[in-house]
Amino acid sequence: MTPPILSMLDLVAVREGGTVAEALQIAVRTAQCAEDLGFARYWLAEHHNMPGIASSATAVLVGHIAGATQTIRVGSGGIMLPNHAPLVVAEAFGTLAEL
C-alpha cells in the first residue's frame, strides 16, 4: 500500500508572551521537522490584523522557509487578493517558483 502524501498548514501562531520573531523561527524549525518526517508540502496562510498570527507577508515567508529547507515544497495556502494587486501576487509567486 502506498503511504499517504502528507502536507501541513501553518498560520505561524505567536505564543502568548512570545514575539513575532520567535514565531517565525519556530515556523522554520517546524518546516524542517515536517521535511525530516517526509511531509511533501508546507503551506502558509495569509492573515492580517491578528496579533496572535505572524503570517501576514506570505510571499516573504514562503521564500524564507523554502531557503531553510531542502526537499519539502513550500507554498501559500491562501492569498487575500482584495488586499493585493493581482499582477504583484503573480510576479512574486512566479519569481519564487523559479528560485
Model-derived regions: residue spans:
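Active-site-adjacent segment of SDR/Rossmann-fold oxidoreductases
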Residues: 98-99
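The substrate-binding groove and active-site-proximal loops of carbohydrate-active enzymes
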Residues: 75-83
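N-terminal beta1-alpha1-beta2 module of alpha/beta enzyme domains
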Residues: 1-74
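Glycine-rich anion/phosphate-binding loops
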Residues: 21-26, 82-95
